[in-house]
Amino acid sequence: MNSLIADPSAHAPAARENLAPVPFGPAPLAEGEVACAYDELLLRISCAVRPADIFEEIWVRDIVDLTWEALRLRRLAAGLMTVGARRALELDLRPLVGFDQARGMARGWAAREPMAVGEVAEHLAANGIAMENLAAKGLGLELDSIERVDRMTMAAEARRNAALREIDRHRTTLARRLRAAVAEAEADAAEEGEAS
């Protein structure tokens, strides 16, 4: 389903039905990302926009790729928050249980292993450490990376929004040309009617 339009005849004039699909290359998937989720996003955006020509097809692919990138970066930022919380947890557990046990408990907690989660909750409660404080400390530990990812997310969203504006501008220009052509045809028809 990596072609841009699932059914070109539903979206394009009959004259374009026999054109080969434009090769945009494979989906820009990172390790662990699911191709069918990307394809679903591509299909839904294509159906919403209904690209009318090759330029709009290119912009739709850009919009999908940039939306996918922004979603990936948001997941990355959430992952960095988890990494930061794990690091903060390990630092807070070291004086309580020792270096090796703190590392193991923090890894298990980050992996959401039930036994590790329970042990961590007990140690935190017994020592008056709130999870919110660990999250804040973890944010501080990863703040530079999270800020960079946030800037990258904003840049991807800005590029996506620019592509959306290009489609709108392209359609406005096309509509203006079509109106002018209709007006010219009507004027020609009126002149022919007066001449006869």
Language-model regions, residue ranges each:
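Intrinsically disordered, low-complexity, charged/polar segments
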Residues: 1-196
